[in-house]
Amino acid sequence: MLTLYIIDTCDTCRKARKALEEKGIAFKTYDLRKDGLSAGLLEHILEGVALVDAVNKRSKTWRDLSQEEKDSLDTSARQLIIQHPTLLKRPLLEVGDKTFLVGYRDGDYDQLGG
């Protein structure tokens, strides 16, 4: 079964969930804020998504970080993401072992079938 990693208040996550439901695709959701983001789960995600692609530099959370935190991203990214799950790009759709679709735009899930 597919897993959709979301933050419930994210509009793009809602669109992704709706697209999967409309296609009749079975999936479970995992709310990164409510359900928590452990170091183990983050490592699991980063096995399928490059760290540079996982950090959402367009988020309010990113903009609110100090310049020092942004500059130390190479060494502290994992710790920052665990502290601030909204730094992780989302939604993340886990479609297979170590295979993730990052973000969502209309039509992204068309190839998944139903």
Where are each of the predicted segments found?
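Local sequence-structure signature of Cys/Sec-based thiol-disulfide redox active-site neighborhoods
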Residues: 1-23, 27-32
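Thiol/selenol-based redox catalytic cores and closely related redox-interacting motifs
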Residues: 32-114
